[in-house]
């Protein structure tokens, strides 16, 4: 089989399964409204959970800092790309979340890959929730360590896997809020079992940070858990992009020596770091509390209105509210129907989710209004 035959076969298989991914160029993709092909849609596909991507205070911070620092960092943080803006953001994140250190990364994917690649050796074992993000599972499968997956949120199964003899160290990996189902991990129970077996816990809280907990401190703070490694990302609750790893000073020093994604990548622009500092200030303020309260009210309104729909509603109190349809083609048809009625919704299909669980992944944000939720419910009930 030639290279072209191999590529064609893979694409044909995706098409046949109604699983071919496509991108749509949009004029505006974050916030309350999505604009595409000169049409405006209510946007129920964005991760901009607090509606901060268009916050004037954050935009102003980026603009002013671009004038001061320029639009790029100029290099890796190990060469010339670590600015006073990066340092200030790291210090503020560490203080906010109760850690000694924070290290910035260009994306959550890079942060997860870097930590696992740097920390895990052949004699070690990773025990991961089987519904963990692709960045975590891919890094675990590519690492030299043994990978074992426990049944989603099943602490008993996790304990059984941890009890199996391991010549090296064990790392338990999970998410705070799961990206496709929107449900939360029982972090306190997971940490207890992990500590009983002398393991370390790594939590990716991409979808909880900024959105839940006191001052938006996220899933771990809410459940009174402090994992050895906490990954937070800035493309969701913060409304910007990038990520950080929170850890002890010793682990931070170790990652600065061995995390190749950090060492060999150009740092985020200093102006971006300043915008993130402005976003963090909003998240921690009374305005941040108000946005979280508004989002919670919108979620409650939505869940009350979909109880009688012929879909499986995930057990989610988060901004991620998937309606599990099952069949790929039906999910695509429903997404298209919603778009025709002015609601932009994305159909998520295997391999992103398990076979037979294709879904409409609806996301709500603090930028929405109650009438937006009512309109979505109207369309879902076939009255649009």
UniProtKB/Swiss-Prot annotation:
Which keywords does this Swiss-Prot/TrEMBL entry list? Biotin biosynthesis, Pyridoxal phosphate, Transferase
Cofactor(s) the protein requires to work: pyridoxal 5'-phosphate
Q: Where pyridoxal 5'-phosphate is bound, by residue?
A: 108-109, 179, 207, 233
Task: Tell me a Gene Ontology molecular-function term this record carries.
Answer: 8-amino-7-oxononanoate synthase activity
Residues that the record marks as modified (N6-(pyridoxal phosphate)lysine) are 236
Q: Which Gene3D superfamilies match?
A: Aspartate Aminotransferase, domain 1, Type I PLP-dependent aspartate aminotransferase-like (Major domain)
EC number(s) of the enzyme?
2.3.1.47
The reply on keyword Transferase is yes
- Detail which positions bind substrate: 21, 133, 352
Enzyme class label: transferase
UniProt cross-references to InterPro entries, sorted A to Z: Aminotrans_II_pyridoxalP_BS, Aminotransferase_I/II_large, AON_synthase_class-II, AONS_Archaea/Proteobacteria, AONS_Proteobacteria, PyrdxlP-dep_Trfase, PyrdxlP-dep_Trfase_major, PyrdxlP-dep_Trfase_small
Has UniProt tagged this entry with the keyword Transmembrane helix?
no
Question: Which parts form a coiled-coil structure per UniProt?
Answer: none
What is catalyzed by this enzyme? 6-carboxyhexanoyl-[ACP] + L-alanine + H(+) = (8S)-8-amino-7-oxononanoate + holo-[ACP] + CO2
Pathway assignment reads:
Cofactor biosynthesis; biotin biosynthesis
Q: Name one GO biological process term.
A: biotin biosynthetic process
Q: How does it assemble?
A: Homodimer.
Q: Which NCBIfam families match?
A: bioF
This chain's function reads:
Catalyzes the decarboxylative condensation of pimeloyl-[acyl-carrier protein] and L-alanine to produce 8-amino-7-oxononanoate (AON), [acyl-carrier protein], and carbon dioxide.
Family listed:
Belongs to the class-II pyridoxal-phosphate-dependent aminotransferase family. BioF subfamily.
HAMAP family, per database record: BioF_aminotrans_2
Q: What is this protein called?
A: 8-amino-7-oxononanoate synthase
């Amino acid at each position: 089989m030639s290279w072209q035959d191999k590529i064609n076969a893979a694409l044909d298989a995706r098409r046949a399964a109604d699983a071919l991914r496509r991108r749509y160029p949009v004029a505006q993709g974050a916030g309350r409204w999505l604009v595409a092909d000169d049409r405006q849609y209510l946007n129920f596909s964005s991760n901009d959970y607090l509606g901060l991507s268009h916050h004037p205070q954050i935009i102003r911070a980026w603009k002013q800092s671009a004038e001061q620092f320029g639009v790029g960092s100029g290099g890796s943080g190990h060469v010339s790309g670590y600015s006073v803006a990066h340092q200030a953001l790291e210090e503020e994140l560490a203080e906010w979340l109760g850690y000694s250190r924070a290290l910035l990364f260009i994306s959550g994917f890079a942060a997860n890959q870097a930590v696992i690649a740097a920390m895990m050796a052949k004699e070690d074992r990773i025990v991961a929730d089987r519904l963990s993000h692709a960045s975590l599972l891919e890094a675990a499968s590519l690492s030299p360590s043994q990978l074992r997956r426990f049944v989603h949120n099943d602490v008993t199964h996790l304990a059984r896997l941890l009890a199996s003899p391991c010549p090296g160290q064990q790392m338990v990996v999970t998410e705070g809020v799961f990206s496709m189902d929107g449900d939360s991990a029982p972090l306190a129970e997971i940490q207890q079992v992990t500590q009983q077996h002398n393991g370390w816990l790594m939590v990716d809280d991409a979808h909880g940070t900024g959105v839940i907990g006191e001052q938006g401190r996220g899933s771990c703070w809410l459940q009174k858990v402090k994992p050895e490694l906490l990954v937070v990302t800035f493309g969701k609750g913060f409304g910007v992009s990038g990520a950080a790893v929170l850890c002890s000073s010793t682990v931070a020093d170790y990652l600065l020596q061995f995390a190749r994604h950090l060492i060999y990548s150009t740092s985020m622009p200093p102006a971006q770091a300043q915008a993130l500092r402005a976003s963090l200030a909003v998240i921690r303020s009374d305005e941040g509390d108000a946005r979280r309260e508004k989002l919670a009210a919108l979620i409650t309104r939505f869940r009350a209105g979909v109880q009688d729909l012929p879909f499986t509603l995930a057990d989610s109190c988060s901004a991620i509210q998937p309606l599990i349809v099952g069949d790929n083609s039906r999910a695509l048809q429903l997404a298209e129907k919603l778009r025709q009625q002015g609601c932009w919704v994305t159909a998520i299909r295997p391999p992103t989710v398990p076979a037979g669980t294709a879904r409409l992944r609806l996301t709500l944000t603090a930028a929405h209004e109650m009438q937006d939720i009512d309109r979505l419910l109207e369309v879902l009930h076939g009255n649009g």
